[in-house]
Design a protein with these regions (language model features):
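A short, flexible loop at the N-terminus of ABC-type nucleotide-binding domains that lies
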Residues: 1-6, 12-23, 72-73
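ABC ATPase nucleotide-binding domain
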Residues: 5, 27, 63, 350-352
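The feature captures the beta-strand-to-loop junction immediately N-terminal to the Walker
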Residues: 37-39
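Helix-to-loop junction immediately C-terminal to a conserved catalytic motif
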Residues: 52
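Conserved coupling/switch loops of ABC nucleotide-binding domains, chiefly the family-specific signature
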Residues: 58-61, 111, 211, 245, ...
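Conserved ABC transporter NBD signature motif
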Residues: 60-68
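ABC ATPase nucleotide-binding domains
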Residues: 74-231, 235
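Glycine/charge-rich catalytic "coupling/switch" loops of P-loop NTPases
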Residues: 254-311, 341-371
Length: 371
């Protein structure tokens, strides 16, 4: 069992004005693929390094497989780590690079050979075993680094931004390779990235962090559909969610968002619990994703109550879609529309959106109101 339990974990560096990681609580199941995601400096890599034993835990307790590991040396934690830099020995062949850690542990030669060749087969680098790192592409070098971790047969894989040095095309293919590798090895993976696309496409669950604090832990779909606050809503999704200034109004049993003259009626099934009663007359932030805004005639006809007149600042053709960068009463908005859209730079365009896709956030706390 390679479950991981992080209980009230803190990392406090000497002289720091605030903890780098604050009250980190997380239960990771055996064989789960967990992603730590957030902007630079949010504490994700520091947390990973505490799991690895490369950083001391300031407060709290950490368990791997039910065993307290706070004071266990990295070599005894049954983990393997893959870094952003491949850290391959340039004078050694691929075979020797993969085998090096096992040789240091005095593993029998026949066992080393078996593990190296098994890893090479899984990673499709059998034909590269006699080459030196300088003869390899970036993707091949990353596979060698993964192979070096694999042969240890660890209970937990820790991957710290392993694809950051690769170009966009190679990152896409390597994402797929790592997902396949996780399924083949059936071990616990913890993957750190600042790239929300990697997070959304790879993880069983995602831990979103900001300023050393967990913001939300959830499945990719739930993070997208039900963000707990404005930070998560804006960080997950590309282009990011639009935020408009509004005021909650109520007429009879109908709640609406007043966007400065344009009333957006909210679906009654989303407001029936009375959560909005305390917000009537108060300002809120209304969120709507770019993909939920459209100027297509059929969509417009379906959502006649949720339409806005906007000004097109920039129309960006992306091939399969167009990004419209819009201005609405001082608010900047982005819409992802079909390539058949006729909207162009400088045009006034009327757009609609699905009210069921509307998110509302408290102006002061930035927490979600409806979810």
């Amino acid at each position: 069992m390679a479950s991981i339990s992080c209980q009230h974990i803190y990392k406090i560096y000497p002289g720091a004005t605030a903890p780098s990681v604050t009250d980190f609580n997380l239960e990771i199941q055996d064989k789960e693929f967990i992603i730590f995601v957030g902007p630079s400096g949010c504490g994700k890599s520091t947390t990973l390094r505490m799991i690895a034993g490369l950083e001391e835990i300031s407060k709290g307790e950490m368990y791997i497989g039910g065993r307290l590991i706070n004071d266990v040396p990295p070599k005894d934690r049954d983990i393997a780590m893959v870094f952003q830099s491949y850290a391959l020995y340039p004078h050694m062949t691929v075979y020797k690079n993969i085998a090096f850690g096992l040789e240091l542990r005095k593993t029998p030669k026949d066992e080393i050979d078996k593990r190296v060749r098994e890893a090479a087969k899984v990673l499709d680098i059998e034909h590269l075993l006699d080459r030196k790192p300088k003869a390899l592409s970036g993707g091949q070098r990353q596979r060698v680094a993964l192979g070096r971790a694999m042969v240890r047969n660890p209970a937990v894989f820790l991957l710290d931004e392993p694809l950051s040095n690769l170009d966009a095309k190679l990152r896409t293919s390597m994402r797929t390779e790592i997902i396949k590798l996780h399924k083949k090895l059936a071990t616990t993976f913890i993957y750190v990235t600042h790239d929300q696309t990697e997070a959304m496409t790879m993880g069983d669950r995602i831990v979103v962090m900001k300023d050393g604090i967990i913001q939300q832990v959830d499945t990719p779909q739930n993070l997208y559909d039900m963000p707990c606050n404005m930070f998560v809503a804006g960080f997950i999704g590309s282009p990011q969610m639009n935020f408009l200034d509004g005021t909650i109004v109520k007429k009879g049993d109908q709640y609406s968002v007043d966007l400065g003259g344009d009333l957006i009626p909210l679906p009654k099934e989303k407001t029936a619990d009375g959560k909005l009663d305390s917000y009537v007359g108060k300002k809120v932030k209304m969120g709507i994703r770019p993909e939920d805004i459209d100027d297509e005639p059929e969509f417009m006809a379906k959502h006649t109550d949720c339409q806005l007149d906007t000004q097109v600042d920039v129309s960006e053709m992306m091939g399969a879609e167009i990004y419209l960068y819009l201005e609405y009463k001082g608010n900047k908005m982005t819409a992802r529309v079909a390539p058949t859209s006729k909207a162009r730079n400088g045009d006034t365009v009327r757009v609609a959106f699905d009210p069921h896709k509307v998110h509302l956030f408290d102006v002061e706390t930035e927490q979600t109101i409806l979810n």
